[in-house]
């Protein structure tokens, strides 16, 4: 199980700058979600994705603060990992996962991880390097998006996973140079035993500086919940938010 945070902005900024004083509250979640952290920046200009991943807790990392402060971009994703049992703690299993101008982060589990492998296009299957369910989720999404387009492709990927796999949560964020897609798709009853009822909730906050989406568990005054079984699509040119039933 993991924590997700992402933003898009009309201006180049950083996570500490756009989130503000409460960013430290989000980072503190790495006391539990301590198996790694990862950052990707996805500029709308189409410049290459910058990817940083470490197998350590963000709050205890000697490089985390400097990395999130210096990576300035108009779009970025941040992931705090709490590894699913049976999935190794390694840099290759640390999110985000990237392909072309797409970057992806996931919170939840798909059992067994390989159950969706037959539905992944061979060109993407050849890119899989570890045993992570999340990596397979990403490449299934890429397979379907290439065939059907962004929203229809994502819906198709979710349908395949739900038909063939056993899942706790498929919450995720996918970003490219044109769009920022956040998915809230989870089984509340399958949260960790210790976690509050809102553990899987995703919330968002439009501001003059951009749009933020994040997992729960930290101070989020004024944020709006993204309803379960829905996705939010942000157009990175207009910053309009479209909420879609999935």
For the regions a language model picked out, list residue spans one by one.
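Extreme N-terminus nucleophile/cap motif
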Residues: 1-56, 76, 182, 187-188, ...
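Conserved beta-strand-loop-short alpha-helix elements that form
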Residues: 2, 102-112
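Fold-independent oxyanion-binding glycine-rich loops
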Residues: 10, 79-82, 107, 185, ...
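Short acidic (Asp/Glu) patches
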Residues: 55-66, 79-100, 120-123, 217
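Catalytic core of PPM/PP2C metal-dependent serine/threonine phosphatase domains
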Residues: 75, 150-186
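Long, charge-dense
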Residues: 117-142
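A conserved acidic, glycine/proline-rich C-terminal tail/linker
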Residues: 192-230
């Amino acid at each position: 199980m993991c924590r997700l945070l992402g933003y898009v902005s009309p201006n180049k900024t950083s996570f500490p700058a756009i989130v503000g004083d409460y960013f430290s509250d989000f980072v503190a979640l790495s006391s539990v979600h301590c198996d790694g952290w990862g950052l990707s920046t996805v500029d709308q200009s189409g410049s290459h994705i910058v990817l940083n991943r470490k197998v350590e807790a963000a709050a205890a990392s000697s490089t985390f603060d400097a990395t999130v402060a210096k990576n300035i971009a108009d779009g970025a994703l941040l992931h705090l990992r709490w590894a699913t049992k049976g999935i190794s703690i390694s840099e290759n299993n640390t999110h985000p996962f990237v392909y072309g101008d797409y970057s992806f982060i996931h919170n939840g589990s798909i059992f067994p991880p390989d159950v969706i492998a037959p539905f992944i296009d061979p060109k993407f299957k050849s890119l899989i390097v570890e045993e992570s369910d999340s990596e397979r989720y990403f490449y299934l999404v890429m397979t379907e998006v290439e065939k059907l387009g962004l929203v229809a492709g994502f819906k198709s990927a979710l349908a395949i996973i739900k038909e063939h796999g056993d899942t706790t949560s498929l919450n995720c964020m996918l970003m490219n140079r044109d769009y920022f897609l956040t998915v809230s798709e989870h089984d509340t009853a399958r949260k960790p035993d210790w976690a509050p009822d809102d553990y899987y909730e995703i919330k968002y906050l439009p501001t003059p500086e951009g749009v933020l989406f994040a997992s729960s568990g930290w101070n989020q005054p004024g944020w709006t919940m993204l309803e379960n079984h829905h996705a939010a699509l942000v157009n990175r040119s207009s910053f309009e938010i479209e909420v879609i039933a999935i």
